[in-house]
């Protein structure tokens, strides 16, 4: 694979949006950016990857602006970093989420109805231009692409979960589905990683430490490395 894989690392929340609040006022946004920066460093030291961060510091970025970065930079994959919370302080562990089929179907239908301009592969762009009025063909192509993306998301999530399990408890051992805005791009495979529960006393304390943040970032990096080394993933053209 000669061309580098472009990963958009999204550090959830930021600025006036603290995200979840944990033990002793621990703010999710701070955990997210620390892990994101560590992951960025690991990926940028690997010739296979190049990275873009949605934020480099404690700044607020709207969902719309985060998603615009996917289009501007021809991103191959989105990793959104978050920390979880619960009213039950005994709940702990990491998990990974991918977009639900219901949500992605809605996004595809919205695109076809609104005919908005989004960044596709050149191959798909050309097909759409040649078949402007063929709704069924466009829908079929986007459905096939979303099915392919979902397989990528599932397989990658499993690789990352394998690595996370070596360093932390898993709240959910398999990828889960949700209707999350950050994951709803019809053009880019995306996953959201909940790195642990900041409302759990022990896990919250761990998530604050550089050592534990490094372990989480390294687990994500190794999962990405293992997946893309083994897979037949083809870059957008």
From Swiss-Prot:
GO molecular function: N-acetylmuramoyl-L-alanine amidase activity
EC number: 3.5.1.28
Keywords, ordered alphabetically: Cell wall biogenesis/degradation, Hydrolase, Secreted
Domain MurNAc-LAA: 7-225
UniProt keyword Cell wall biogenesis/degradation, yes or no: yes
Subcellular location per the Swiss-Prot or TrEMBL entry: Secreted
Top EC category: hydrolase
Keyword Membrane tagged: no
Swiss-Prot/TrEMBL GO biological process terms: cell wall organization; peptidoglycan catabolic process
Family listed: Belongs to the N-acetylmuramoyl-L-alanine amidase 3 family.
Reaction(s) this enzyme catalyzes, per UniProt: Hydrolyzes the link between N-acetylmuramoyl residues and L-amino acid residues in certain cell-wall glycopeptides
UniProt function note: Cell-wall hydrolase involved in septum cleavage during cell division.
Chief location category: secreted
Name assigned to this protein: Putative N-acetylmuramoyl-L-alanine amidase
Superkingdom of origin organism: Bacteria
GO cellular component: extracellular region; outer membrane-bounded periplasmic space
């Amino acid at each position: 694979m000669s061309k580098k894989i472009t990963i958009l690392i999204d550090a959830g929340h930021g600025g006036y949006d603290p995200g979840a609040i944990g033990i002793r006022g621990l703010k999710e946004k701070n955990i997210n950016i620390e892990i994101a920066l560590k992951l960025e460093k690991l990926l940028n030291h690997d010739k296979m990857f190049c990275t873009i961060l949605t934020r480099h510091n404690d700044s607020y970025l709207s969902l719309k602006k985060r998603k615009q970065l996917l289009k501007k930079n021809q991103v191959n994959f989105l990793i959104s970093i978050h920390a979880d919370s619960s009213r039950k302080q005994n709940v702990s562990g990491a998990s990974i989420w991918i977009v639900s089929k219901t949500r992605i179907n809605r996004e595809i239908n919205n695109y076809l109805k609104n005919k908005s301009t989004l960044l596709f592969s050149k191959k798909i762009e050309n097909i759409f231009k040649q078949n402007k009025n063929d709704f069924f063909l466009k829908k079929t192509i986007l459905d096939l692409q979303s099915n392919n993306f979902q397989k990528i998301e599932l397989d990658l999530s499993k690789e990352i979960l394998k690595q996370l399990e070596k360093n932390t408890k898993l709240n959910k051992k398999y990828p889960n589905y949700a209707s999350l805005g950050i994951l709803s791009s019809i053009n880019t495979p995306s996953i959201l990683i909940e790195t642990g529960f900041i409302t759990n006393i022990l896990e919250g304390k761990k998530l604050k430490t550089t050592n534990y943040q490094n372990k989480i970032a390294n687990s994500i990096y190794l999962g990405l490395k293992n997946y893309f080394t083994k897979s037949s993933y083809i870059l957008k053209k």
